Structure formats: structure tokens, C-alpha cells
């Protein structure tokens, strides 16, 4: 990247990007041995968005990513393309959207001052929008047919939901108005190695398998909210939980623990999404504690080896500053002995001054810390930050209501 600050500023402003943190070259003192891990909820990215290479919102998102230049990038809310997704074409391979994003946007420089980055994609099935066939919201209806999904607006903004879509989504294993909506994509630089045969996923783990499950109760009868047949099958993860081992050039394996728990809310007096969010976050605590109930989708039980370095990444939809008892799980995760919870990414002082209503560690426009890159305590942390645009660079159609969050780590020999 060129080092002339005014040249950079003008070029990046043209794509809605102004320096909100130090560029990669300035932030990392030893790039050869350092890894930048970043999470970014880009907000409801659809297959139809990714089939084209000129979607304005994705171009701006890609510019931000290229500026920050992560080695490992988790994108939340990218559709896992599959049958039932309105943008899916019969006969195409499933789960190809991460590759589309890497090819159409990230590999192509989004400004003269930026460089394209070559990433290898990891995209795996999720529960969102996959219908359960059960009445999970207790409204007396089961509507298993995907309704008509509104097309994307011409300005590139996020498509609206419909009542029919919400009715369908409320009975899916994780809320989504069509199969695969709000999925996840992990993108890893080509000079690192994804150990694909060792990936563990926990998409199918049933909630009742957790011994101390936070069971939602009907506030009138104080009986379990879910009917027995629904509770027997209810999955814990609203999207999925992934353990993706990434081998670094020196041979060290870094485990990427990726997830996107359900948002607390949108659920009525029983607060079933609060309960679920709590236990989805707690699943990572239990995984670090090597709990035996944690069984992956291949049938292997147990958690992460006690010496394994890792980063917990994703939009956890939980703010530790929220006094609710349901946020105890995220506080336990941050305070876990195996987690370096003292590292709190923050916005730069200049960007904080631009929006004083936000706390320095807020990662969402709606004033909350919900997006995380939590390094293990056996990693050396070199730098961290929350990237925010300047007010002058905010486009009429926002890229997302979340900000990119990044941490630079190094594995000590």
C-alpha cells in the first residue's frame, strides 16, 4: 500500500472508506510471524448479490477488508447457497458464495491504493432457514414451504422481510426466511493451510444434550416452552459452531472457533432466544472445558485440547456490559482462564470523537459490543481495533450496522 496519507485518504473516500485504524503495514511489527484475525457482520448478503461483481455495498465492504488485510476473516450473515435459496440455481454446487465473494470482490482491488487479496473459502451448512417441520414458536401453525422472497432494492440495501417470511422462519432451526440465510463464511489467506479433514462442526447438537441447559419456561404455567417433541429435536446452534484448524507457515495450528448465536429478542415473554443465546455462547465455554456432552456432527465427543491456541470469532449477539443474567455466558467466556479477555479492541480516538454516543469498544451502530475476536491466553497479542468510518465517508446505503473487529496475534514458540 502506498504511504502517502493524502493519496490514500482520497482514494478510499471514493469507495466510502477512510482510515479508521492503522493499516496492516503499520499495525503489525512482524508480519512474517503474525496473524490478523478479523470478524465482520456485513448484514444479510444474498446469493444474487454475489453473482455480480459490482454490488455497491459489497464493493465498499471489500474495500474495508482490503484496507485492514486480515489473514483470517469471518463474515457473518452470508447466505449458504442451497436449494430453497431464491438465488440458487439447480445443479450448481452448494455453499459456493464464499468463493464468489473471494473471487468477485476480495481478489480485485477496490481502489488504486488497495491490493486484491487471494483467500481460500470455508463455507459449511447452517441451521438458519432450514425448516424443522415443527411448531417451534407455538403459534399453532407449521408452514414448511418457503414463501416468495422479495428481491434486492436497486440501491443495494438490505432486502425487506415479509410477514410470510417471518412465519416460515420462526419454525426453522434458526431464524431465516429461506434456507441458508444469515450463514457464515471463513476466508483464509492462501499462504495458510486449512486442515479441512480436521474441521469440527456442531450444527446438529441438540439443546437438551447440554446437562445444564437454560430451558425457556412459559411465563403463565411455568412449564417448558417447547413441546416435548420439539424439545427432543431442538438444535442448540442457530447457525452452526465451527472449529476450523488453520496451519501457519511455521507449522503451528491455530483453531478458529466461529459462530453467530441467535440475537436475544424477537421472542415474547418466555425469552426463548435469550435462553438460546446464553447456551450458544456457553457452548464455547464448555468446549474449552472439554465437556463430554459436546459431540460434533461426525459423532466425536469432547472439547478442544488444553494446549491448543485458538481465536473465538463472530457476532455473539451478547454484550458483557448488559446487566442481564443472560449475558453471564459471555462474561464467563471473556473471563475464562484459557482466554485473553484483557484484550478489548477499541475504535481509534478520532473515530470515537466522531460518535460519542458509542463506547470505544462498541462494535455495532446500535451501541453494543457484540462482535468478538477473543485470542487464547497462549497467544501474544500485538494490536487490536474496531474500525469505524468517518461521518463524511458514510454512504447513503450503509454497508452494515456492524463494524469490522480485528486482533493481531503471534504464536510464541
Where do the language-model regions lie?
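Bacterial N-terminal signal peptides that target proteins for export
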Residues: 1-9
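C-terminal motif of bacterial Sec signal peptides marking the signal peptidase cleavage site
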Residues: 18-20
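Metal-dependent phosphoester-hydrolase catalytic domains
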Residues: 187-211, 236, 245-248, 273-312, ...
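Solvent-exposed loop/turn segments at secondary-structure junctions
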Residues: 42-47, 78-82, 126-131, 192-194, ...
Amino acid at each position: 500500500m502506498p504511504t502517502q496519507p493524502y493519496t490514500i485518504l482520497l482514494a478510499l473516500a471514493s469507495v466510502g472508506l477512510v482510515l479508521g485504524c492503522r493499516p496492516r503495514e503499520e499495525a503489525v511489527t512482524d508480519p512474517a510471524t503474525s496473524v490478523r484475525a478479523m470478524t465482520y457482520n456485513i448484514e444479510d448478503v444474498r446469493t444474487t448479490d454475489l453473482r455480480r461483481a459490482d454490488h455497491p455495498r459489497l464493493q465498499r465492504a471489500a474495500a474495508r477488508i482490503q484496507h485492514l488485510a486480515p489473514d483470517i476473516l469471518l463474515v457473518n450473515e452470508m447466505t449458504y447457497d442451497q436449494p430453497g435459496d431464491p438465488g440458487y440455481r439447480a445443479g450448481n454446487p452448494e455453499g459456493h458464495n464464499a468463493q464468489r465473494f473471494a473471487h468477485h470482490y476480495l481478489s480485485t482491488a477496490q481502489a488504486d491504493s488497495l491490493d486484491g487479496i487471494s483467500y481460500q473459502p470455508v463455507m459449511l451448512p447452517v441451521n438458519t432457514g432450514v425448516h424443522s417441520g415443527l411448531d417451534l414458536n407455538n403459534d399453532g401453525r407449521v408452514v414448511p414451504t418457503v414463501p416468495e422472497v422479495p428481491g434486492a432494492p436497486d440501491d443495494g440495501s438490505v432486502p425487506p422481510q415479509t410477514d410470510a417470511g417471518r412465519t416460515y422462519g420462526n419454525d426453522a432451526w434458526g431464524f431465516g426466511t429461506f434456507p441458508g440465510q444469515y450463514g457464515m463464511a471463513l476466508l483464509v489467506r492462501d499462504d495458510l493451510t486449512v486442515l479441512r479433514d480436521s474441521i469440527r462442526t456442531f450444527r446438529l447438537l441438540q439443546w437438551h444434550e447440554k446437562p445444564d441447559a437454560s430451558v425457556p419456561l412459559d411465563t403463565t404455567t411455568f412449564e417448558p416452552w417447547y413441546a416435548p417433541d420439539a424439545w427432543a429435536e431442538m438444535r442448540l446452534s442457530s447457525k452452526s459452531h465451527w472449529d476450523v484448524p488453520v496451519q501457519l507457515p511455521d507449522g503451528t495450528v491455530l483453531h478458529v472457533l466461529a459462530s453467530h448465536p441467535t440475537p436475544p429478542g424477537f421472542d415474547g415473554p418466555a425469552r426463548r432466544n435469550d435462553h438460546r443465546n446464553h447456551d450458544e455462547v456457553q457452548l464455547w465455554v464448555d468446549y474449552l472445558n472439554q465437556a463430554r456432552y459436546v459431540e460434533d456432527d461426525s459423532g466425536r465427543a469432547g472439547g478442544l485440547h488444553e494446549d491448543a491456541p485458538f481465536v473465538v470469532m463472530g457476532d455473539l449477539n451478547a454484550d458483557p456490559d448488559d446487566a442481564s443474567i443472560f449475558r453471564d455466558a459471555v462474561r464467563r467466556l471473556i473471563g475464562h482462564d484459557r482466554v485473553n479477555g484483557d484484550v478489548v479492541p477499541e475504535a481509534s480516538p478520532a473515530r470515537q470523537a466522531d460518535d460519542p454516543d458509542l463506547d470505544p469498544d462498541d462494535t455495532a451502530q446500535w451501541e453494543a459490543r457484540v462482535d468478538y475476536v477473543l485470542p487464547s491466553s497462549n497467544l501474544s497479542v500485538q494490536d487490536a481495533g474496531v474500525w469505524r468510518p468517518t461521518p463524511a465517508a458514510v454512504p447513503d446505503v450503509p454497508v452494515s450496522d456492524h463494524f469490522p473487529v480485528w486482533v493481531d496475534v503471534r504464536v510464541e514458540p
